[in-house]
């Protein structure tokens, strides 16, 4: 599933081609996504794009009379095309722009979403979200406060959007490795120093992935059709049985809430 770095990479890739241009029309080939494509999107015509923003794993296209909310789901990606190209099986949505560009949404598993709202505030998919991990609000003090009475393992707690948004399976595993914290540790057992370190490394890991265009393991592509290259830098995720890059101990795989977790027994305590 695309996580925060992949969504932010998509935002940065499409923004220069959309902002200041006008949506001539939308071409919906298959509107049966996780939720049906909103009727308002079908009716788009001569609509300027004012901004392209991100909240958690949602892309937000600001229009004069409302917002398009895009979620990439499990396998979605957005590409900018310079000219019309024949659509393939999983190309479900096109936004045809006045500058000759086409924003194409591809989603083999159709777990993504294209929604419309007049106002962002209070929309159900954006309500009850925690802070952005790259914001000043997310820091060691905040993390310690939220972990203090939490009797659950730290790995699934990091993936809870009520705590912090956008830290999915890949980056939770990678951040815990970078901080030397075992994923099974109770959140409440983390010291102030460990919370400070973990908050810092989460930011560092996410920023490094954004610099590399995100992580492509299967479906994700950047807006220019290229894969993300952070997969080459993964320390533990997806490396079950391979030697730890630090100590050589085989990487272990386990599960938390049916999600794979990877860690090093020697480096993480």
UniProtKB/Swiss-Prot annotation:
Active site: 2 (schiff-base intermediate with dna), 3 (proton donor), 57 (proton donor), 259 (proton donor)
Keywords: DNA damage, DNA repair, DNA-binding, Glycosidase, Hydrolase, Lyase, Metal-binding, Multifunctional enzyme, Zinc, Zinc-finger
GO molecular function: 8-oxo-7,8-dihydroguanine DNA N-glycosylase activity; class I DNA-(apurinic or apyrimidinic site) endonuclease activity; damaged DNA binding; zinc ion binding
Binding site for DNA: 90, 109, 150
SUPFAM superfamilies, A to Z: Glucocorticoid receptor-like (DNA-binding domain) (SSF57716), N-terminal domain of MutM-like DNA repair proteins (SSF81624), S13-like H2TH domain (SSF46946)
The keyword Zinc is annotated on this UniProt entry: yes
Alphabetical list of CDD domains matching this protein: EcFpg-like_N (cd08966)
Record-linked HAMAP family: Fapy_DNA_glycosyl
Subunit text: Monomer.
Family matches, as NCBIfam families: fpg, PRK01103.1
Function noted in UniProt: Involved in base excision repair of DNA damaged by oxidation or by mutagenic agents. Acts as a DNA glycosylase that recognizes and removes damaged bases. Has a preference for oxidized purines, such as 7,8-dihydro-8-oxoguanine (8-oxoG). Has AP (apurinic/apyrimidinic) lyase activity and introduces nicks in the DNA strand. Cleaves the DNA backbone by beta-delta elimination to generate a single-strand break at the site of the removed base with both 3'- and 5'-phosphates.
Name by which UniProt lists this protein: Formamidopyrimidine-DNA glycosylase
């Amino acid at each position: 599933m695309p996580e925060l770095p992949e969504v932010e990479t998509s935002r940065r890739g499409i923004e220069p081609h959309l902002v200041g241009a006008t949506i001539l029309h939308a071409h919906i080939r298959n509107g049966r996504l996780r939720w049906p494509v909103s009727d308002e999107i079908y009716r788009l015509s001569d609509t300027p794009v004012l901004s392209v923003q991100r909240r958690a794993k949602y892309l937000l296209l600001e229009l004069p009379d409302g917002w398009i909310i895009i979620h990439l789901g499990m396998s979605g990606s957005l590409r900018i095309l310079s000219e019309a190209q024949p659509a393939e099986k999983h190309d479900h949505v096109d936004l045809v722009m006045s500058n000759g560009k086409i924003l194409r949404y591809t989603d083999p598993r159709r777990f993504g979403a294209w929604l419309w709202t007049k106002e962002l505030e209070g929309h159900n998919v954006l309500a009850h979200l925690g802070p952005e991990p790259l914001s000043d609000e997310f820091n060691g003090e905040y993390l310690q406060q939220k972990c203090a009475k939490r009797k659950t393992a730290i790995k699934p707690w990091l993936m809870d959007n009520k705590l912090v948004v956008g830290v999915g399976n890949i980056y939770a595993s990678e951040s815990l490795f970078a901080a030397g914290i075992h994923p099974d540790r109770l959140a409440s057992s983390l010291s102030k120093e460990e919370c400070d370190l973990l908050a810092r490394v989460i930011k560092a890991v996410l920023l490094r992935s954004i610099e590399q265009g995100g992580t492509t393991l299967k479906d994700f592509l950047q807006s220019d059709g290229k894969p993300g290259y952070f997969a080459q830098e993964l320390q533990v995720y997806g490396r079950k049985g391979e030697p730890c890059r630090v100590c050589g101990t085989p990487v272990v795989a386990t599960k938390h809430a049916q999600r794979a977790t990877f860690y090093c027994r020697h480096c993480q305590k």
